[in-house]
């Protein structure tokens, strides 16, 4: 069982967000999600400049087991993508909360972050699954 970082917020669909110094939010999938998916073989990311809506599909993670849609945890504009995942999708497995991030969003409504789960709330989601 992995420890869930307390400095992040989480969506029940297993994405995490971290606020950055410039006001954007980095998005990735949780350790729990990557464990369920298994070894990543391909990641399809949104384009910089794309507008995304909270709860909408915006990326795909393909593993040896399955392909899984990745949902935007908050609405806003994609301001960066982790191009390292194109050549090294396994970074999602080795460092889900660090080098395995997917993209960054500049939020259009920062109050949406308040609706996300804290570490304890996300643990409850995992426990109920």
UniProtKB/Swiss-Prot annotation:
The keyword Chaperone does not apply. Its cofactor is (R)-lipoate. Signal peptide: none annotated. It comes from the Bacteria. The modification N6-lipoyllysine is found at residue 65. Keywords: Lipoyl. Transmembrane segments: none annotated. Binds 1 lipoyl cofactor covalently. PROSITE patterns: BIOTINYL_LIPOYL, LIPOYL. The glycine cleavage system catalyzes the degradation of glycine. The H protein shuttles the methylamine group of glycine from the P protein to the T protein. Belongs to the GcvH family. The glycine cleavage system is composed of four proteins: P, T, L and H. This is Glycine cleavage system H protein. It comes from Shewanella denitrificans (strain OS217 / ATCC BAA-1090 / DSM 15013). The lineage of its organism: Bacteria, Pseudomonadati, Pseudomonadota, Gammaproteobacteria, Alteromonadales.
